[in-house]
Amino acid sequence: MTTYQTPNPLRLRLKLEAGRIDIITWDEPRAEVEVTPLGDDQASIEAAQNVQQELRGSGENQELSVEAPSGRSLFGLRRGPELRFAISVPHGSSIDSTTVSADVAGRGRFGTAKVNTTSGDVSLGAVAGDANVKTVSGDLDVERVDGKANLSSVSGDLELGPVAGEISASTVSGDLHVTSAGSSVNAKGVSGDVTVESVRRGEARVQTVSGDITLGVAAGARVWMDVSSMSGTTQSDLEPDEGGGGGDVDLRIKANSASGDIRLQRAAPVASA
């Protein structure tokens, strides 16, 4: 294990082809990094020993990089040994991670999060700033985002807790589920379903080919709607006077699908803390 003195939140830059990355945030004024091989072969042991670690900067501008050596062959037919990064950093630190088939799990409170992966799953705690995640077949689960959320996936499912800022998301066969959206939503899918339990203001633009669309409208929000499905069904639980027939509206909904079903409903009331 390697320990670094980091009294302030830092930027954590990670690179790992295969394995697992576990990150926690804590109150301690230091960062700790432990690298272990997930296999007992010599190649895995040597790969763990050759991981590059470096702390750059000072004060509030520190950056800690942890990068595993590439284990791919000349034609990319063989991936590197599997390693595990176990990292602890101060609360509010930001993540910039690039992996191939490594899972990324972050618990605690982060500043911003940028994660690029191919087949690894991603789970994160609370993100105070923006969250940008790109995955091909990995699933994504984020507890909360206080900034903007920009997500893309091919076959992985996207699960988001409350998001205060704008949401931009695209999927092919993966599902998108959002607990609540505090601002505009722009979501595109092919066969995956799109569900936003609660949206109050801005613009909700959702398009799918065969995936179903479910949007919950927060209580009291006046809505303008443009909803259509060529061969699917459309259903709205909103009362006639709740639609924005004229005047000011809080939320503009444009939901379209080729064969998916579309449902608009009032969002469930938020329970008091």
What are these regions (language model features)?
Residues 1-273:
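Intrinsically disordered, low-complexity terminal regions
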